[in-house]
């Protein structure tokens, strides 16, 4: 009997999927099984569109199509929680399995607390994540550092602190992530600061960290994180679609060491990005960025991209706003940003969506991440975990 907190090395029983998927195709097999058995109505994942740098959400209803979404896409920066609420009605009337990075999973949990996502209808298959990369700079990085045509890259992966790319002719090149980031490339800045790499708030947490011995590179390390995850894995095992074996104890230790090293690296980047990390109060953080806020065009891009912003009638709109929000001014009053902060910052998961779409290049993710960290210190609230309600959240009727 599989239980919460159990760990396994897993690989697909289907040789074709094991070859097409990464690390034994365990995730692909689980998603296909869930669809084929009617446990879910659809699978929400990501797929490449024009190329590896153009990553889009994909809703899969045919089990045979699941393999199309197999493999890593580190240039995929979108947050799938936004897709669930905006286009799938929060899974209110359909059952879905969603592949989630840690920030996706944490956002889903926050939206479940607000009853914007039906937790009973969602299975979260978590994927370990050490960070994603901005696609435009990614193409530039391929030309300048790897000296290859960006369009010739057919595969990329992050392993042992290096970004490894493979081109059409089978050539592999690798460069340490640290070297790329020292030059302003590599992972997104919000990903560098992120201290959550294993999505234990999902139902299953899957990745290649800790798989050693004969199955190294041929199996997925799966940690069971919820009773729902245990039930899914048990059913897949009983159906014979997935092979499980106990992980090597040394592998468990290695996995924890990798996670610990990534957390330390995130702490370093937080120290680099945030002045006086331990000492500043919340409002002094906002004061620090007034010059940045002066570049705001009031385009509402941050609101539209933020997966935590979901109100149908937004108080930031001129006809809905309170008296202290000035109307028709560009840039808007700092109260514009303060009002938005009060609505979402305790649940900010540092997914970086706001910063990516800002035409004024305001470092929004950096600002809100720092404020969120201050709120954690003040209230002890950890976003994206458990079922505790956010400390200052309010949920207007009808929103």
UniProtKB/Swiss-Prot annotation:
Residues 287-307, 339-367 form the 4Fe-4S ferredoxin-type domain. [4Fe-4S] cluster 2 binds at residues 306, 348, 351, 354. Its EC number is 1.17.98.3. PROSITE patterns: 4FE4S_FER_1, 4FE4S_FER_2. Optimum temperature is 55 degrees Celsius. Optimum pH is 7.9 (when assayed with coenzyme F420). GO terms for molecular function: 4 iron, 4 sulfur cluster binding; formate dehydrogenase (coenzyme F420) activity; formate dehydrogenase (NAD+) activity; metal ion binding; oxidoreductase activity, acting on CH or CH2 groups, with an iron-sulfur protein as acceptor. It comes from the Archaea. Is extremely sensitive to oxygen. Contains a FAD that is required for coenzyme F420-dependent activity but not for methyl viologen-dependent activity. Preincubation of the FAD-depleted enzyme with FAD restores coenzyme F420-dependent activity. Neither FMN nor FADH2 can replace FAD. Strongly inhibited by cyanide, azide, alpha,alpha-dipyridyl and 1,10-phenanthroline. Pfam families: FrhB_FdhB_C (PF04432), FrhB_FdhB_N (PF04422). It catalyses: oxidized coenzyme F420-(gamma-L-Glu)(n) + formate + 2 H(+) = reduced coenzyme F420-(gamma-L-Glu)(n) + CO2. Binds 2 [4Fe-4S] clusters. The keyword Thylakoid does not apply. [4Fe-4S] cluster 1 binds at residues 296, 299, 302, 358. Belongs to the FrhB family. Catalyzes the oxidation of formate to carbon dioxide, with coenzyme F420 as the electron acceptor. In vitro can also use methyl viologen, 7,8-didemethyl-8-hydroxy-5-deazariboflavin (or FO, a hydrolytic derivative of coenzyme F420), FMN and FAD as electron acceptors, but not NAD(+) or NADP(+). Dimer of an alpha (FdhA) and a beta (FdhB) subunit. This is F420-dependent formate dehydrogenase subunit beta. It comes from Methanobacterium formicicum.
């Amino acid at each position: 009997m599989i239980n919460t907190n159990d760990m396994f090395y897993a690989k697909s029983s289907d040789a074709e999927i094991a070859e097409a998927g990464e690390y034994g195709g365990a995730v692909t097999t689980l998603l296909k099984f869930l669809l084929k058995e009617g446990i879910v109505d659809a699978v929400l994942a990501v797929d490449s569109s024009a190329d590896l740098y153009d990553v889009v959400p994909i809703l899969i209803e045919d089990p045979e199509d699941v393999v199309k979404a197999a493999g890593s896409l580190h240039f995929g920066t979108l947050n799938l929680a936004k897709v669930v609420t905006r286009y799938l009605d929060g899974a209110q009337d359909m059952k879905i399995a969603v592949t989630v990075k840690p920030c996706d999973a944490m956002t889903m949990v926050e939206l479940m607390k607000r009853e914007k996502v039906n937790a009973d209808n969602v299975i979260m298959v978590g994927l370990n994540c050490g960070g994603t990369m901005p696609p435009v700079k990614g193409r530039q990085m391929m030309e300048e550092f790897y000296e290859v045509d960006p369009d010739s890259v057919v595969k990329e992966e992050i392993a042992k602190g290096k970004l490894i790319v493979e081109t059409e002719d089978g050539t592999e090149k690798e460069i340490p992530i640290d070297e790329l980031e020292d030059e302003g490339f590599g992972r997104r800045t919000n990903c560098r600061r992120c201290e959550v790499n294993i999505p234990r708030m999902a139902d299953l947490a899957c990745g290649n960290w800790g798989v050693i011995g004969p199955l190294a590179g041929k199996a997925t390390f799966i940690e069971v994180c919820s009773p729902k995850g245990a039930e899914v894995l048990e059913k897949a095992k009983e159906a014979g679609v997935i092979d499980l074996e106990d992980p090597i104890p040394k592998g468990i230790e290695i996995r924890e060491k990798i996670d610990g090293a990534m957390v330390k690296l995130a702490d370093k980047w937080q120290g680099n990005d945030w002045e006086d990390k331990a000492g500043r109060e919340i409002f002094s953080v906002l004061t620090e960025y007034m010059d940045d806020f002066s570049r705001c065009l009031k385009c509402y891009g941050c609101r539209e991209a933020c997966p935590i912003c979901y109100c149908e009638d937004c108080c930031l709109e001129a006809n809905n706003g309170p008296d202290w929000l000035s109307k028709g001014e560009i840039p808007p009053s700092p109260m514009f940003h303060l009002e938005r902060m009060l609505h979402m910052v305790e649940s900010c998961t540092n997914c970086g969506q706001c910063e990516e779409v800002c035409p004024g290049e305001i470092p929004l993710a950096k600002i809100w991440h720092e404020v969120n960290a201050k709120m954690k210190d003040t209230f002890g609230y950890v976003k994206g975990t458990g079922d505790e309600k956010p400390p200052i959240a309010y949920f207007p009727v009808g929103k």
